[in-house]
């Protein structure tokens, strides 16, 4: 950690098609081996499919899906006197988005559909309907935090 000054967070350029920073971040998370144009085409075709299914605009449908996957609390390990406790802590807004996007991409990669665009579209539509692997992951994290509520006073 630097001692001199706090280093500001880099500004992310909004994506070219919709002008959304959130979507640009999602493309970056999906990107493999620096192939951004490939990642963008996958995301855009997935969003088109999603918009046709839901009847909403591409960005609106994406926002709904992301909102249903965002976690509000998570557990962090805290060592107290020789034993480790899973302490529930609130998730910061930036991390909420990052976790939600990461979980959606992971869930889409594990699906068995034909193309990645189709997998992503299916996972996003499942997330919009509050079902699917990414939503299940959020529920598991929330359940874990609820189960360890007794250790909330160890927060730092």
UniProtKB/Swiss-Prot annotation:
Highest rank taxon of the organism: Bacteria
GO MF entries: rRNA binding; structural constituent of ribosome; tRNA binding
Keywords: Ribonucleoprotein, Ribosomal protein, RNA-binding, rRNA-binding
Gene3D superfamilies in UniProt: Ribosomal protein S7 domain
GO biological process per UniProt: translation
Entry GO CC: small ribosomal subunit
InterPro entries associated with the record: Ribosomal_uS7, Ribosomal_uS7_bac/org-type, Ribosomal_uS7_CS, Ribosomal_uS7_dom, Ribosomal_uS7_dom_sf
Family: Belongs to the universal ribosomal protein uS7 family.
Binding partners and assembly: Part of the 30S ribosomal subunit. Contacts proteins S9 and S11.
Function: One of the primary rRNA binding proteins, it binds directly to 16S rRNA where it nucleates assembly of the head domain of the 30S subunit. Is located at the subunit interface close to the decoding center, probably blocks exit of the E-site tRNA.
Protein name as it appears in the record: Small ribosomal subunit protein uS7
Biological source species: Escherichia coli O6:H1 (strain CFT073 / ATCC 700928 / UPEC)
Gene this protein is translated from: rpsG
